[in-house]
Amino acid sequence: KRYIDRFNLEGSSKKEEKNIEDLFKIEELQIDDTNKIQELIENIKKEKKLIYFLEKENSSELKNIIKKKITSITIYIQKNKTSYYIKINDINEFTSKFKDVFENKDIELYGYKLNEDYVMLKELGINVGNLTFDAEIAAYVLNPSTKYNLEEIIEQYLEINVDDFIENNKEDENSSQINLFDNLDSSKENNKKDLYKKRYSIYVYGIQKLQEIMSKKLEEINSLDLFTNIEMPLVKVLGEMQFNGMYVDKEELIKFGDSLKEGLKELTNEIYDLCGEEFNINSTQQLGVILFEKLGLPVYKKTKKGYSTDVEILEKLKDKHPVIERILEYRSLMKLNSTYVEGLLPYINENTKRIHSYFHQTVTQTGRISSTEPNLQNIPTRIEFGKRLRKVFKPEKGYVFIDADYSQIELRVLAHISQDEHMLEAFKNDEDIHVQAASKVLGIPKEEVTKEQRSSAKAVNFGIVYGISDFGLAEQIGVSKKKANEYIKQYLEKYSGIKKFMDDIVELAKNQGYVETSFHRRRYIPELSSNNYMVRQFGARAAMNTPIQGTAADIMKIAMIDVYNKLKEENLDAKIILQVHDELMIECIENDKEKVKSILKNCMENAITLLIPLKVETSEAKTWYECK
């Protein structure tokens, strides 16, 4: 039943709708009022729950990992239905009073964006104990394609509009936030504080109610175990990874930038020579005129502004003129310099000399972890300059990187889910899966499969995981669309278990509206009921891909939690610092490296039992570049 009905607010006047007292009381406490704070802490200990919200303020001059400072904490006590708002003027006083409560493993923590809280509190010397409920993560598990703003979550699940419960509308409040540091008189200040107090009080009341409702909803869709035993324990792991960061040799990064600029200079001169004149290579209009009018290259696409010179077009023109290769390389180096040299430098923390990326678990629809500020997961590795960039990422002196990589995890998951006999056989016998595919499709003995044939089979194997089209395969392996179509057809005839899985999963998604991973991570696919053919095709690819990529992502998360716990248990001087798709990286002291390799291999290979074994390869290195 709607909360608005339950509190008899339907049909009442706006003034009554905004009446907070119908739901809970609000008290403001002073951080230096030791008796009152102690009384609050005793209540938290009795309830064994800390339902809280931290107000944070951006502060770019801070040298912290997260450039924000905590300005207030609001806490909700269920027993007396009271929200306590505490302004924090002295962060040390906050730390001394609340450290024990946050660290107490018997007290469950309920909040929102706990990953960020974890890092900020750890910087204050608080090692957060029992992270139990994060409203953002619960909303993500319930539906990975929606937004996770706390007010939107409260409105969606509790049908409470936060703005209906405060005096000002959103526009007025935002304008008052903008003027936060202006010379406001005390009444304006008090009014603003009152608004914040009410807003954050509704947040903590909402978090408590959300925990009750969302837990039931998670149970209904069989995802409570995923939330409780995978997603919530992962918060701490990702928080630790951000806190740990990755050391960057700043001087070497600057030198690398200089070498890129030199490379760009050389390429610029080569491009000018090959084109017979100087022009602005970064101007698509000028480049279009040079390529298609002066050099007379075939035109594939025109836009309102002129000729299209995007990567796809340039790739098609590669064999038409030697300048195209240089232009593609020029663009790659430009991107490397702007995104990964000039882009990385501001992220090096002055205190730690490390880059502390955010790792997100509520972004991708398949359950994969992503990273931002900066994104270390998409540093290009196909071009040599991109690979060389990884040389600037190093362990501290006396430490070493241990890198562990799942071997073909998505194909192993596909073999397990589809139960295709040929694929299962290849993995059980530790055969080269791509050689086997080429042999079956082309009808030739395995020992006769050429490098090129294996490469084509590899493109199909991995393409199947992503729902590749004949056009996509043709582009990738350089054959006609017809030939690519025949290849896919023959592949699916030989691997009939995979064909059946693909047909069945799309049909299932059409009927029930969603697909799931092996761990009941659900993804809704409304695209399958679209009137647009292209949208439906996207839906079909998502239906095929999500159970595979999503299950692989879940396995990686389980492995990360197990590795983290084992490193702690063994009391090793080692920490997880990076996760990129199927790869996990640890920085550890030289003496512990063999133990760490063993832990990584053991935890990752035994994260789940499939019909075929999971295989992990480990390596050690003195730079990220040297990792296999």
Give residue spans per PLM region.
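Nucleic-acid-processing active sites and adjacent nucleic-acid-binding tracks
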Residues: 76-111
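A common structural junction motif
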Residues: 495, 602-610
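Active-site palm subdomain of RNA-directed nucleic acid polymerases
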Residues: 218-230, 234, 555, 559-580, ...
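Metal-dependent phosphoesterase core characteristic of DEDDh/y 3'-5' exonuclease domains
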Residues: 116-169, 237
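Conserved "right-hand" nucleotidyltransferase catalytic core of DNA-directed polymerases
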Residues: 1-87, 153, 173, 177-384, ...
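Short, conserved charged micro-motifs
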Residues: 93, 283, 591-598
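Conserved catalytic core of nucleic-acid polymerases
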Residues: 186-187, 243, 349, 356-357, ...
